[in-house]
Regions:
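S-adenosylmethionine-dependent methyltransferases
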Residues: 1-377
């Protein structure tokens, strides 16, 4: 693989992560050669009451909850290869949250305060993991994938994005699948985020907007929003999620044989068991994750999550992990992750190889490629 990114710090709003420390965290032990500690995926901490347990969210239920929501979105390009992308505006998400708060007082107040920006935190462990924002390394993945999009989209039957948030890499692949207009896609998107609210507020909305902008004619764009009411305003920068439009989205995705699976909750053994069930019939999987190793506590868990998914004998997996080289003020680093990963591969004599590629950027970022068996492309 060969690529050279030329991003500069001016390409992003490179906010420092502001994290509420969790003094109750139980450090995860690494498995050394003679180490009797359990796999980090089996850590008792991951089962504590304050940790959201993983579950598959019902897509139809999420779509029904978005009925009559008007989305304001931004069309923009990836920094290097100028790949077109779409994301829901953050102020629009906050507007929806405020409207929902006025009508439903049962919302998680702590999570809501962080989502609305009422605290100084970008995230808080086990409460909100930062998924509403689009972080720099997700753009790196988009530009990397774009280099080999034709081979990628034709050689995989599943995309798994862990810690997806706005899911820009998956959105890019989703659009590529839509452009094929092929009813024999047989392509599955598994999108996971700790917060179900993130899946509802940005992950699925971004896919719906991408679908509408990609497949609908101007007439369909207008008609599906207006229905029988000509008084409903239609804009090129907004999308009203009418019942007709949501039904059209759901039906068209099914017609194209594209499956969308949404998983909320924490990583760990229960999460991986769900993933293995969802991937049971998949032969070639592209696993993507960005900005998920920012805390040393998370690092062994995400590494073991990836290694466990690679362990399936009937599935060929290729993984891209995008991250900043060092997360100042938080403690995670790409070097520590790479060292942990390579130590496990070596000590376990695993049929997996990894390689790190530098992103040519003043922000100092990297992408680690992890492959099982032969590379898919």
């Amino acid at each position: 693989m060969s690529f050279s990114f030329g991003f500069t710090s001016n390409d992003f709003d490179d906010d420092e992560l502001v994290v509420q420390p969790d003094a109750s965290f139980e450090p995860v032990q690494k498995n050394g050669k003679n180490d009797t500690h359990p796999n980090p995926l089996d850590s008792g901490f991951l089962l504590q009451p304050n940790v959201v347990q993983p579950k598959v969210e019902n897509l139809e239920t999420l779509l029904q909850g978005l009925k009559d929501v008007r989305l304001t979105f931004e069309e923009f390009q990836s920094p290097l290869y100028k790949m077109p992308l779409i994301r829901r505006e953050l102020f629009d998400v906050k507007h929806q949250l405020m409207l929902e708060t006025d009508t439903d007082s049962s919302n998680n107040s702590t999570e809501l305060d962080i989502l609305l920006g009422d605290t100084s935190e970008d995230l808080r462990k086990n409460v909100y993991e930062g998924g509403l924002k689009s972080w720099e390394c997700s753009y790196d993945l988009v530009d990397l994938i774009s280099e080999k999009i034709d081979k990628t989209i034709n050689n995989i039957d599943a995309v798994l994005e862990i810690g997806c948030g706005t899911a820009l890499p998956s959105e890019f692949l989703f659009k590529s699948a839509l452009l094929r207009d092929d009813t024999s896609n047989n392509l599955k998107f598994i999108l996971s985020d700790y917060n179900a609210s993130v899946l509802r507020l940005v992950t699925i909305p971004n896919l719906i907007i991408t679908w509408a902008k990609t497949v609908l004619t101007n007439e369909e764009w207008s008609a599906l929003q207006k229905g029988e009411s000509e008084d409903i305003p239609v804009s090129s920068e907004e999308l009203l999620l009418s019942s007709n439009l949501l039904t059209a989205f759901y039906d068209d995705v099914q017609r194209r044989n594209i499956t969308i699976v949404l998983i909320s909750g924490s990583w760990g053994r229960k999460f991986n068991n769900l993933i293995h069930e969802v991937l049971l019939d998949s032969k070639k999987v592209l696993l993507l994750t960005s900005e998920t190793i920012y805390q040393p506590d998370n690092l062994p868990v995400i590494a073991e999550t990836i290694l466990d998914i690679h362990s399936s004998p009937q599935t060929e997996v290729q993984t891209y992990v995008a991250a900043k080289d060092i997360y100042f003020g938080v403690g995670g680093s790409i070097v520590e992750f790479e060292n942990y990963l390579n130590k496990k591969i070596s000590s376990g004599n695993l049929p997996i190889r990894s390689e790190r590629f530098k992103v040519n950027s003043g922000l100092k970022r990297s992408i680690i490629c992890i492959e099982t068996n032969q590379a898919m492309y």
